[in-house]
Amino acid sequence: MKTTDVVAWFGTKKAIAEACSEDGWKLTAAAVSQWGEEPPAGRQKQIAALTKGQLTAGSAPSQPETTPAQPSEGQQEMTDNRIEDLNIESIATLVTPTQLKEEMPISEQAVESVCKGRQAIRDILDRKDHRIFVVVGPCSIHDVDAAKDYAQRLRDLAEEVSDTLYLVMRVYFEKPRTTVGWKGLINDPYMNDTFKIQDGLHTARRLLIDLAELGLPLSTEALDPISPQYLQDLIAWSAIGARTTESQTHREMASGLSSAVGFKNGTDGSLTVATNALMSVANPHRFLGIDQSGQVSIVSTKGNPYAHVVLRGGGGKPNYDSVNVQIAEDALSKADLAQNIMIDCSHENSSKNPALQPLVMDNVSNQILEGNKSIIGLMVESNIKHGRQNIPANLDDLEYGLSVTDGCISWEETEDAIRKMREKLKDVLPGRTAG
């Protein structure tokens, strides 16, 4: 029996030390009785072996950083380490969604902001609101102060263009990686491979509350199927990325999200995975998840009627042009889906060159001027400064307001592009109707 198994039953190193004889960590009957209960029958042989000296002086386990789970009442066998969890190093208990929300309750002001944001986006998708909604902001959040700085600027711009464009701040905490790399603020908030996920959840929720209280509608990518229980109450629009659009887990999750959700086409440019996702997410599902108390549960959803496609390019080619938009319209029509199309101005639609994003925005404006009725939204990767930076070994060397993931356009470029779009579309959008 491994020393980790001893820890799993008797708790911490300290508890074992107090329960065992001083001459060599031999477990005795007193060690069992100290815990006030007899061990399960399946552990009798293991404890007997330990009392014969298999756990000797010098093999005392070091204090684990996490507390392994205790056996449930009535459990007859402990995990057989010959066949289970062979590649698991440790399992740590996490704050529950309820506990986090009790620590950081959402204010009435933030609730009002979320409700207004969700309704505005639903109205745009239903063609009750003539505006285009623009999800704009950093590729990922790594600096809370810079995010708040950006949000203040965006709020002012949002008010300026609100008659034509509905601006939604992009607040992405989770990053899918093609291979390896920094997975975002929730996974590694200190950017030093310490992976303090609980701290990441606290930081993310605190920031979302602060931004919602500014009156900004907020968006994020729903990547981890657990995190929405901690954060979704603050989100007005969600994205499912190109790498996960085909995932059954993410389709099921999206069917229960409270916000509208955009599904990107596949990384190869395929529309089929996105249209299949839209058909799936509109229907009820039952799947395994967690409830607000963190209990593993069977989740039954109603289906999400506000899912739509996001064209982001793929296979090394863009797909924002009028020809590809028409192809997407035809695919949606064939699948009997609403012709709601969002254009991602970044990724392969800009050849991963942030400087090309304003050109994509201008092209989309021209399509609408020429009569397009299916484009209802845009995504723009924008930050305070233009470009990107690698994460330095010394985090003090990070440049303020500069992305650490995908390259972004600067704030000045963002203002200019959005104002130009508003100027082009302000007269034509009020008369625009669904085709």
Regions found by a protein language model. Give the residues of each.
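Recognition helix of helix-turn-helix/homeodomain-like DNA-binding domains
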Residues: 21-39
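Conserved, mostly hydrophobic/aromatic
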Residues: 137, 343, 410
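Active-site or pore-adjacent capping/gating segments
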Residues: 369-435
